[in-house]
């Protein structure tokens, strides 16, 4: 069983990203559990979400204490407490420019990539593409299918934009 913790702030799309990630993993044949955890419900407040995935049945519903993967939507949140949440051999993906990439820490300026493509900060979607490119799951095809399903009511233009953002994050991982 693999576990992911997503850290961000209210309004950054942490909940949506966890939903897309969970649905994509399901499409790739994993059993999944996903749930957000909120503090005060206001824009900018710290938010986290959890995703578990396994090829076998998941029987636990508790919050994730230590993760195989951590995705950080705002590099200002990255500190020693978050680092302690990483399992041995785990990996961290950070949206930022100041954080330093090391053996198991990957940094992508997902916000800038998003602004260049659409003039808005949809870094959550860029990060999902990078997650797929770096770690091999879920497949990019499964994430795109999840985006189609989750954003179906928003129309083709929104779906096409999100697929473009996913692809940009995915492609970035191979250009490093």
Q: Where do the PLM segments sit?
A:
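Active-site cofactor/cluster-binding pocket
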Residues: 1-176
């Amino acid at each position: 069983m693999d576990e992911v913790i997503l850290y961000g702030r209210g309004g950054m799309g942490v909940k949506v990203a966890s939903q897309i990630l969970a649905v994509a993993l399901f499409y790739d044949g994993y059993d999944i559990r996903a749930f957000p955890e909120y503090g005060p419900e206001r824009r900018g407040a710290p938010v986290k979400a959890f995703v578990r995935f396994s090829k076998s049945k998941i029987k636990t519903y508790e919050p994730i204490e230590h993760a195989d993967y951590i995705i950080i939507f705002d590099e200002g949140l990255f500190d020693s407490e978050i680092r302690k949440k990483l399992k041995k051999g785990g990996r961290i993906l950070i949206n930022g420019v100041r954080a330093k990439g090391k053996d198991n820490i990957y940094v992508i300026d997902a916000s800038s990539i998003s602004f260049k493509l659409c003039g808005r900060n949809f870094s959550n979607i860029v990060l999902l593409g990078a997650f797929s490119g770096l770690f091999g799951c879920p497949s990019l095809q499964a994430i795109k299918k999840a985006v189609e399903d989750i954003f179906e009511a928003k129309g083709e233009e929104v779906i096409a934009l999100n697929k473009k953002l996913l692809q940009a994050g995915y492609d970035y991982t191979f250009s490093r």
